[in-house]
């Protein structure tokens, strides 16, 4: 049984076996207490080890913080506050010791900076344990949300030849000897001789491939790792992160916004119900507005404004921004957070951005100046969802590709979707780690993923 199940359901006077790692030990005259945890819950199980147990002294000597243990015994009612039961051990097995002189985790609050240096052990701490349980609940809620609505989970490729965002910040995939790659007569790298016969990269987004799937299955979603070779050493950026990207045929920008709002509300409600102890922990120890923010999202409709209205509100704010505000700029995090935190005090959706700052595939509006794009902005995070109605008109899409100096031949298959049964369609992308960061109040995105990948850091 997992310790969470034992704490919640184990009957008094029943005999059970508990497995886990020692969090604390207290030695008293004639007996000892240990608390063991297995990661299934914030709370540990208290185990009482009587001094009359065979090999008591040898066992207790090994039961230091971090030791792996199995304890079998009788469930009894606990006289202590805050715990329903405890376990009176009849047999204890120590599987692996942890030397207290060298084990880096002890019963004290460690800094997140220190914990990042021992990423292989930090999951054992209360904070990181809570993060991973909330992360798991978020992932479960995402799949459940889409499956309940008939979406197909599309497995899009991690190795790709396309750059969805057009940013060029992609990790190359090659089988060449980097010290001596094969070259053409002109001296350029000869990708025709490489593994895929052409340049290949780690994906920055599964969107374009999801559009392919949506043209056959109507409503699909992707949920997987994406990669960005962006040399940003900040608390908001990762080189490897997970994205959720639904794509819906027969859908416009309004339907896209409706789904995004419903989606976020569903996830927050699910996590509050699935992880109440963990969310209380974050509210108490990390950010005392976490629970209020979650309830705000669940109970209130998101504000919706256009980009033009957002610019007007920013200009009227009399606030001095690092990046000056004028129509045509790409909203920066400081602008997004001012709108969400200070002005509206809740998530809002900004739509209809200037075409010159958005991707080629976004549908051109009738004003010929803006595209049917939308961003969901959240307090403390800024943009948490970005999406758009896609350009379904072949002639307009071809013109946009030409205007942005993109090689149309590389997108022949994407253009084919507009030649054969084109239809209005829309979708969005959610940065999964930013969602978890927003949910938990954690200040650094590196602390909401098990193994963060950042510039000059690829440990494990």
Swiss-Prot record:
NCBIfam families in UniProt: asnS (TIGR00457), PRK03932.1 (NF003037)
GO biological process assignments: asparaginyl-tRNA aminoacylation
Sequence similarity: Belongs to the class-II aminoacyl-tRNA synthetase family.
Matching Pfam families: tRNA-synt_2, tRNA_anti-codon
Localization terms from the record: Cytoplasm
The species this protein was found in: Picosynechococcus sp. (strain ATCC 27264 / PCC 7002 / PR-6) (Agmenellum quadruplicatum)
Location (main, coarse): cytoplasm
EC number: 6.1.1.22
Catalytic activity: tRNA(Asn) + L-asparagine + ATP = L-asparaginyl-tRNA(Asn) + AMP + diphosphate + H(+)
SUPFAM superfamilies: Class II aaRS and biotin synthetases, Nucleic acid-binding proteins
InterPro entries listed in its UniProt record: Aa-tRNA-synt_II, aa-tRNA-synth_II, aa-tRNA-synth_II/BPL/LPL, Asn-tRNA-ligase, Asp/Asn-tRNA-synth_IIb, NA-bd_OB-fold, NA-bd_OB_tRNA
Recorded GO CC terms: cytoplasm
Keywords: Aminoacyl-tRNA synthetase, ATP-binding, Cytoplasm, Ligase, Nucleotide-binding, Protein biosynthesis
Subunit structure and binding partners: Homodimer.
Protein known as: Asparagine--tRNA ligase
GO molecular function, one term: asparagine-tRNA ligase activity
């Amino acid at each position: 049984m997992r310790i969470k199940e034992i704490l919640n359901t184990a009957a008094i006077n029943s005999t059970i076996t508990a497995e886990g790692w020692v969090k604390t030990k207290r030695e008293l005259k004639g007996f000892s207490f240990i608390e063991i945890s297995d990661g299934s819950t914030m709370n540990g199980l208290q185990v009482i080890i009587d001094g009359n147990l065979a090999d008591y002294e040898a066992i207790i000597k090994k039961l230091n913080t971090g030791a792996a243990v199995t304890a079998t015994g009788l469930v009894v009612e606990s006289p202590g506050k805050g715990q329903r039961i405890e376990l009176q051990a009849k047999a204890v097995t120590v599987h692996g010791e942890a030397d207290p002189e060298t084990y880096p985790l002890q019963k004290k609050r460690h800094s997140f900076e220190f914990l990042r240096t021992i990423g292989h052990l930090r999951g054992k701490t209360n904070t990181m344990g809570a993060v991973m349980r909330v992360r798991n609940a978020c992932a479960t809620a995402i799949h459940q949300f889409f499956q309940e609505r008939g979406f197909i989970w599309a497995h899009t490729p991690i190795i790709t030849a396309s750059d969805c965002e057009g940013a060029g910040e992609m990790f190359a995939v090659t089988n060449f000897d980097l010290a001596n790659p094969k070259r053409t007569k002109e001296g350029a790298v000869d990708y025709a001789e490489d593994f895929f016969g052409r340049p290949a990269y780690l994906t920055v987004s599964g969107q374009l491939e999801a559009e392919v799937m949506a043209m056959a299955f109507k409503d699909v979603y992707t949920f997987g790792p994406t990669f960005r070779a962006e040399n940003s050493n900040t608390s908001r950026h990762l080189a490897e992160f997970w994205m959720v990207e639904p794509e819906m045929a027969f859908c416009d920008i309004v339907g896209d916004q409706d789904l995004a709002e419903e989606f976020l509300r569903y996830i927050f409600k699910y996590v509050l119900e699935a992880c109440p102890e963990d969310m209380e922990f974050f509210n108490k120890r990390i950010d005392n507005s976490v629970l209020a923010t979650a309830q705000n999202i669940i109970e209130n409709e998101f504000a919706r404004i256009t980009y033009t209205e957002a610019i007007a509100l920013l200009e009227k704010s009399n606030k001095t921004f690092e990046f000056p505000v004028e129509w045509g700029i790409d909203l920066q995090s400081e602008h997004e957070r001012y709108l969400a935190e200070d002005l509206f005090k809740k998530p809002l959706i900004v739509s209809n951005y200037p075409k010159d700052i958005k991707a080629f595939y976004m549908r051109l509006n009738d004003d010929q100046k803006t595209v049917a794009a939308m961003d969901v902005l959240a307090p403390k995070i800024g943009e948490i969802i970005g999406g758009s109605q896609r350009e379904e008109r072949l002639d307009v899409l071809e013109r946009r590709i030409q205007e942005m100096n993109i090689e149309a031949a590389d997108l022949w298959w994407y253009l084919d979707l507009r030649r054969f049964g084109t239809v209005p369609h829309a979708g969005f992308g959610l940065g999964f780690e930013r969602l978890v960061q927003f949910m938990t109040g954690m200040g650094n995105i590196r602390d909401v993923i098990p193994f963060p990948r950042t510039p000059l850091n690829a440990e494990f």
